[in-house]
Amino acid sequence: MTTDTIVAQATAPGRGGVGIVRVSGPAAEQVAEIVLGKLPRVRYAEYLPFRDEQGQPLDQGIALLFKAPNSFTGEDVLELQGHGGPVIMDMLVRRILQIKGLRPARPGEFSERAFMNDKLDLAQAEAIADLIEASSEQAARSAMHSLQGQFSGKIQQLVESLTRLRIYVEAAIDFPDEEIDFLSDGKVAGDLYAIMAELDDVRGEAKQGALLREGMKVVIAGRPNAGKSSLLNALAGRESAIVTEIAGTTRDVLREHIHLDGMPLHIIDTAGLRDTQDKVEQIGIERAWAEIEQADRVLFMVDGTTTAAVDPREIWPEFVDRLPKKIGLTVVRNKADLTGEDLAPSQELGHAVYRISAKTELGLSALREHLKACMGFQGNTEGGFMARRRHLDALERAAERLLVAKEQLEVFVAGELVAEELRLAQESLSEITGEFSSDDLLGRIFSSFCIGK
């Protein structure tokens, strides 16, 4: 239970028609009486002057008072909606801070108090920040679905299923003399398999939700004059990179951020890779490799007029040897307008091969679809939810625990070990909603929020 009262501007800094100052805590009513000269009717909008310490009006606007627990934070809350000039907002906040017991809110503290007072769970609290930071319409819709509890509901359903299964398994352990062998009657295995399937579905949705939030990093790499910068320009839809016939034109990393059907895509053009004595070009090549090694996918650009090869190892074995195994590689044969080769995508020795013309944009639509498919993107995200990297990690750990539980059940018929793995899976899932989270984790999450949220 908090004893202090916090205040902050809830709207973004800067000039605007309306600015909102939010107060939350036990002294909210006292603030209202001092600043407004009266106590507004609860949950009714009243148009009132906001007064300074001498009783002179600082501003005038709408005052809204909410009583605990019927507020965003679950505490007494006062919201003052005035004119959105930065000077006016600052004067109003400073006036409120003169009142005893008031202090400035930390970043995310209003949402943190809402979480601590069970007004929303941790995934919903994170969805507030994701909604504010959404970079596309689909990302905003998915964040709203998370805020409304869609993601949390799926997690809670999994936790409840695990709880019921744990009860059944532990009952079998506690009553070993019963005539029925509970662990071998098929119910435990059937329920466990159903939970694992349900978890896999949620993991798939969460991966797409994380994709909408974070996007994927695609690095265009290859030898000089393969058409890397031309592809960057074609994907970006503008002349972002300088394109010439001179090898080594691109000497530094160029970045473009675009959206493909709502999916954030971070495209990085790099210097052509080759042996060179040019010090500046060498630095560019070192930076290129640094980006390649952190990519989600590499587009390996090949000048189709110089070779008919499609196997990257045949084209450049040293490049393939240095590329980290975890990074996906797509071969992009450029200048198909000159070679006249078939544009149909193909699979060659485990690598996708696309034929395009970065100059005329032949085959570019197929490459765009490939990039979306690489991250498991699906066109229909209307019912999706937003997810973060920590959510994916928690889901992955829960899945690993259930795989161990499955082995303990099928191979060893070890009820105690099955129950323990189910408990660990529950803990991992509960981290997502905050039912089982360390103070350090909560601090990191809420400190990343805006002040006033």
Swiss-Prot record:
Q: Where does (6S)-5-formyl-5,6,7,8-tetrahydrofolate bind?
A: 22, 79, 119, 453
Copy out the cofactor comment: Binds 1 potassium ion per subunit.
According to UniProt, the name of this protein is tRNA modification GTPase MnmE
Q: Which Pfam families match?
A: MMR_HSR1, MnmE_helical, TrmE_N
Residues reported to bind GTP: 225-230, 244-250, 269-272, 334-337
Q: Which family does it belong to?
A: Belongs to the TRAFAC class TrmE-Era-EngA-EngB-Septin-like GTPase superfamily. TrmE GTPase family.
Organism placement in taxonomy = Bacteria, Pseudomonadati, Pseudomonadota, Gammaproteobacteria, Aeromonadales
The UniProt transmembrane annotation reads none
> Which organism is this entry from?
Aeromonas hydrophila subsp. hydrophila (strain ATCC 7966 / DSM 30187 / BCRC 13018 / CCUG 14551 / JCM 1027 / KCTC 2358 / NCIMB 9240 / NCTC 8049)
Gene name in the database record: mnmE
Any one of the GO BP annotations? tRNA methylation
